[in-house]
From Swiss-Prot:
Disulfide bonds: none
Gene: rpl31e
Protein species of origin: Desulfurococcus amylolyticus (strain DSM 18924 / JCM 16383 / VKM B-2413 / 1221n)
An example Gene Ontology molecular-function term: structural constituent of ribosome
Membrane-spanning ranges: none
Protein name stated in the entry: Large ribosomal subunit protein eL31
Family: Belongs to the eukaryotic ribosomal protein eL31 family.
Domain of life: Archaea
Any one Gene Ontology BP term: translation
HAMAP family found in the cross-reference section: Ribosomal_eL31 (MF_00410)
One GO cellular component, as annotated: ribonucleoprotein complex
UniProt cross-references to InterPro entries, sorted A to Z: Ribosomal_eL31, Ribosomal_eL31_dom_sf
Keyword Ion transport: no
Keywords in alphabetical order: Ribonucleoprotein, Ribosomal protein
Length: 92
């Protein structure tokens, strides 16, 4: 975790395998909710959680029924505004 001013940056690997236990028709929807829930659990002070559109596209890339099993994200938490922004981390 790196900290500068009121901003905290951290990289997390979020496992999404739990969404495969339920019905097939709404797995991507549940994956988005699971990401929000994960961020809320790890950043308890966050009043607002904003997901990047690229992350949303990545989760929906294989359709509604087959989201990825895990996703690597960078979370930027602004302590002053109590806002967490979630970005897709590009792994090269």
């Amino acid at each position: 975790m790196s900290e500068s001013g009121g901003m905290v940056k951290s990289v997390h690997v979020i496992p999404l395998k739990r969404v495969y236990f339920g019905r097939r028709m709404n797995r991507a929807d549940r994956a988005i909710r699971l990401v929000r829930k994960y961020v809320a659990r790890h950043f308890k002070d966050a009043e607002k959680i904003i997901l990047d559109p690229e992350l949303n596209k990545y989760i929906w890339s294989c359709g509604r029924e087959k989201p990825p099993r895990r996703v690597v994200v960078e979370i930027r938490f602004n302590k002053n505004e109590k806002e967490a922004r979630v970005f897709l981390k590009r792994v090269k």
